[in-house]
């Protein structure tokens, strides 16, 4: 069904219609992007899925009779016993709850997180199936309604107040939206600024999501669920820096750490809307508003350029090479040099209207 022009000019929706049609055609071919060969690593890259664990990959062994493995073995058994009780009693606990059951034994939260991921991978089940949840940090706003697992009706709006991403994405039902696109915003500050500038109403109907930086599992699950349910165009708005690009890649292609859950988390159809490094020159953004790449930034950029999915994204590679050559990065806030509401009033509407994504 084609989108009816409401609010913004008809051409805006025509562009989205064309993009949506191409996405659906790609889906019928079996993926979110044109088919291309993947690279076999410990995690394999496939265009239609992202980074996923290869069958029969290298395994980590923990032996109960090995002095080096005693503590890890004990930690795994401890968490497995907690999971068993949770499943048996049909109750749930957060990762933080599990950490505080014996904080001295675990040492820190990261240890718990990694073991839970290992158990989920070992049993080949999503983390929610282990009855382990985590507090969502993401936010959502725009044209969206749904019912949570406990029956709570949630009605997101296009106003200045966002709704927290649900902690149990699998449990939400009766999802309703008329949105023409989904915009993923890297940073909370940018997300809030767009809400304050009435962007959602101006470009209505749409949905906006932010993971407040590196997205948590629930935010990624929500984006995936919205894509699977509605197949509307999904765009990302990130800083023109290596960190922002990596966050965008996590949404689109996933991460090595969660490659065993790639089918539930990745959205390869995601497009990069902005801020593009090429936009910096095109918009004549002054050099004194830019930030030099640090050595760490350059290492991160080199790392991303070597990843297998970059080979099937020549336009992304070109943008990253522009950044590498200039040795400069820019935050989205650099656009305020042009005007305080340039992002919401000019930049994003024009990008969406004229298909300025890659």
Segments (PLM) and residue ranges:
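Nucleic-acid enzyme cleavage-core boundary/entry regions
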Residues: 1-233, 242-358
């Amino acid at each position: 069904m084609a989108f009816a022009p409401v609010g913004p000019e008809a051409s805006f929706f025509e562009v989205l219609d064309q993009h949506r049609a191409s996405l659906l055609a790609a889906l019928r071919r079996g993926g979110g992007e044109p088919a291309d060969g993947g690279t076999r690593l410990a995690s394999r890259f496939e265009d239609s899925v992202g980074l996923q664990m290869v069958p029969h990959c290298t395994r980590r062994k923990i032996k109960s009779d090995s002095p080096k493995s005693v503590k890890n073995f004990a930690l795994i058994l401890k968490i497995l016993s907690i999971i068993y009780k949770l499943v048996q009693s049909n109750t749930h606990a957060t990762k933080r709850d599990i950490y505080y059951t014996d904080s001295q034994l675990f040492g820190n939260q990261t240890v718990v997180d990694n073991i839970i991921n290992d158990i989920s991978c070992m049993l080949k089940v999503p983390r929610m199936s282990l009855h382990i949840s985590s507090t969502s940090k993401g936010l959502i706003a725009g044209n969206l309604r749904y019912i949570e697992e406990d029956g709570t009706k949630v009605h997101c709006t296009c106003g200045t107040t966002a709704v927290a991403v649900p902690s149990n994405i699998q449990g939400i039902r009766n999802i309703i939206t008329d949105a023409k696109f989904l915009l993923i915003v890297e940073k909370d500050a940018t997300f809030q600024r767009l809400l304050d500038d009435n962007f959602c109403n101006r470009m209505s109907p749409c949905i906006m999501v932010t993971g407040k930086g590196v997205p948590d599992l629930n935010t990624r699950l929500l984006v995936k669920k919205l894509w699977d349910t509605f197949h509307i165009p999904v765009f990302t708005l990130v800083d023109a820096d290596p960190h922002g690009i990596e966050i965008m890649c996590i949404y689109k292609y996933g991460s090595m750490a969660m490659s065993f859950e790639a089918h539930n988390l990745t959205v390869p159809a995601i497009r990069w809307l902005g801020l593009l490094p090429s936009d910096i020159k095109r918009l004549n953004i002054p050099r004194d508003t830019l930030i030099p790449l640090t050595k760490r930034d350059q290492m991160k950029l080199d790392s991303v350029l070597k990843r297998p999915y970059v080979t099937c994204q020549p336009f992304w590679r070109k943008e990253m090479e522009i950044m590498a050559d200039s040795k400069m990065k820019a935050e989205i806030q650099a656009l305020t040099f042009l005007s305080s509401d340039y992002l919401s009033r000019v930049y994003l509407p024009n990008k969406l209207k004229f298909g300025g994504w890659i």
